[in-house]
Amino acid sequence: MQPFIISAAPLQGYTTHIWRRAHHAVMGGVDDYTTPFIRVERGAVRRHDLADVAPAMNDGVPVVPQILACEPAEALLMMNELIRMGYRHIDLNLGCPFPPIALHGKGSGMLAQPERVAKLMAALASVDGVRYSVKMRLGWDDDSQWRAIVPLLDALNPVRVVVHPRIGRQQYGGEVNMPQFEQLLKVAGWPVFYNGEITRREQIDGLRQRYPLLSGVMVGRALVAHPALLSPERASADHYRTFHDLLVTGYRSLLTGGDHQVLSHLKALWQLFLPDAPARARKAIKKSTSLTAYLAAADAAISAL
């Protein structure tokens, strides 16, 4: 019997290598971390994206790099870079719902174009020695579009397919479509993971009981909001303080623009992080204009746990 896997979802701007290392070191509770997508711009793989998945920056962290592409040539360019780095498990993004991506036929926008998906699958399948996983939605503008896509994924023999049961046009609004998810789960010939609206650990147990065929789950925004979500024994203020200290140290080491740049990155985290922290502390974080003021406000927020 295959083990049930819990994976950390990629969130652009949040789950950087700094966040992943801190989470893995202090909180844990997940089996692996899928990275924010890597993409090609002006004919080259973005250096910033490659730096984020560099093995030296992810030492000891079980990482699965994710690529975003609609053209075989772009996909193969990224594959070559990742293979050169030593990666042998790579994830394909067929799920990004954001219009600037999807309206260009990438991410979930590709789900409305099965002929392009077929060409991409053929190109990826030609690469030897790589295991693939896929992150996808039910479709772009129709919740039955997955039916034309699922048979095409067989070319990759994916080790898992993570399904967010909305269509791309919904982005993160509206209800998840569990009836369509159930149908996909029944016909899939490979392991299926569920992703979407998981905010409590107990929900994972419920999903496992309801769907015996389910092979795993992927948890996203709720894990950024509550990093100890899947390791409640580490939900103390001391653990959160250590976690936050690692983020501060990481950004100070990485960024060259001084405290102002570090402050900008740390404040952005609080758009999701610890939403139940006292309003006064959260307001002080938002208004802070120096790293010293920020650190005092952040400590007040964490001390209230």
Located regions from the model:
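Flavin-dependent oxidoreductase catalytic cores
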Residues: 1-305
